[in-house]
């Protein structure tokens, strides 16, 4: 046991001369010395940890900094012992592959030779010297990042120009670009465009079509470059089409190809919709009345018209041979034709038919889908034509003309565009056969009068 004594004087003891009140119980004027006793045990003494103790035999200190080791020389082993004259001899005779003698140029620079001097001694221009040095460096970076000797060996002959063009790309981009160059057999101009396209692609965010091309595919980057250039030309134009075809030729992703095909050939669905609308507009502009004959309509008609009938597949000859004039005379209105004919049809005297006079003829078609310019109903038709009005005059009128397999109807504007001046006759009426399940007997709401 340890005993500690200390005299403790109170800092609060104050003199009575200052006029301050002093408590005689808690603050004695002259305090007596006070003895403080306590016991220090072994548990209170901190133990020294072995972890904090210095070992008797400390381990050897590790070397934190490795000594400087200069990079290996880029000069091939067989050329390292050459002097300047030997290096110049190798360069002048091109006595190795281009990437093997390219480091000799840098070595000569170190020896004090200037590019013009080397050009004079070796015949390698200053521009070519730079291309060889940079191309060799690009080749080394690709060689260190891949394990495909077939790819890098493809640049053994004449590869300096191609590799020089992709010098500004990252190592990963260089590998992808080099692979694309070999696969597509791209020349130096194409390699230059490829490198420029890869570097420029991120800056084109927001441009038309940007999202349809894949930045990770070098072919898509080059394709997008050509696509942007195509938009600088008029649409349509040969220059624009040529650039789009060039872009389609190098595109890799399906999304990019679809975009370019749409630009070249249009959207198929949009084209179908456009064609449908065009056909609807043509139907609205047609000035031919189309009627469906009703059962018993001829019998109930107060007046009728009799017309000779020709089959469409019989062609032009039968149309010309058909009787031109049919006369009904006498008290009983006996019909008399100028010559005999096999087939006749009786129709109500509708205004378009009654206005024909002479020269009328009815041509029978087996399938309306091959005749009408709109969707047919797969049924036969009778087309009434006026052979007297055979001159093509009305742009919006329809005329009976000769086709490959017989006869057909064609619009006047189309005939004029082909400089066709005459036809077999102008169409005045199209008649559908009677049918019980069709109450809409008049399919065209034209005012015949």
Swiss-Prot record:
InterPro entries named among the record's database cross-references: RAF1, Raf1_C, Raf1_HTH, Raf1_N
Lineage: Eukaryota, Viridiplantae, Streptophyta, Embryophyta, Tracheophyta
Keywords from the UniProt entry: Chaperone, Chloroplast, Coiled coil, Plastid, Transit peptide
Pfam family, one: RuBisCo_chap_C
Name of the protein described by the UniProt record: Rubisco accumulation factor 1.2, chloroplastic
Residue interval of the organelle targeting sequence: 1-61
PANTHER family: RUBISCO ACCUMULATION FACTOR 1 (PTHR35299), RUBISCO ACCUMULATION FACTOR 1.2, CHLOROPLASTIC (PTHR35299:SF3)
Coiled coil: 262-288
Main subcellular localisation: plastid
Annotated stretches, region: C-terminal beta sheet: 288-434
Family listed: Belongs to the RAF family.
GO cellular component: chloroplast; chloroplast stroma; cytosol
Domain of life: Eukaryota
Record text about domains: Has 3 domains, the N-terminal alpha-helical domain, an extended flexible linker and the C-terminal beta-sheet domain. The N-terminal alpha-helical domain stabilizes RbcL dimers and RbcL dimer-dimer interactions, facilitating RbcL(8) formation. The C-terminal beta-sheet domain probably dimerizes Raf1. The 2 C-terminal beta-sheet domains are swapped and pack against each other to form the dimer interface.
Annotated signal peptide: none
The organism of origin for this protein: Arabidopsis thaliana
GO terms for biological process, alphabetical: ribulose bisphosphate carboxylase complex assembly
Function: Required for assembly or stability of RuBisCO. Acts at a postchaperonin step to fold and/or assemble the large subunit (rbcL) into RuBisCO. RAF1 brackets an rbcL dimer (rbcL(2)), leading to rbcL(8)-RAF1(4) complex formation. In the next step, RBCS displaces RAF1, thus resulting in holoenzyme formation.
Record localization: Plastid, Chloroplast
Subunit description: Homodimer.
Region annotated N-terminal alpha-helix, chain positions: 75-264
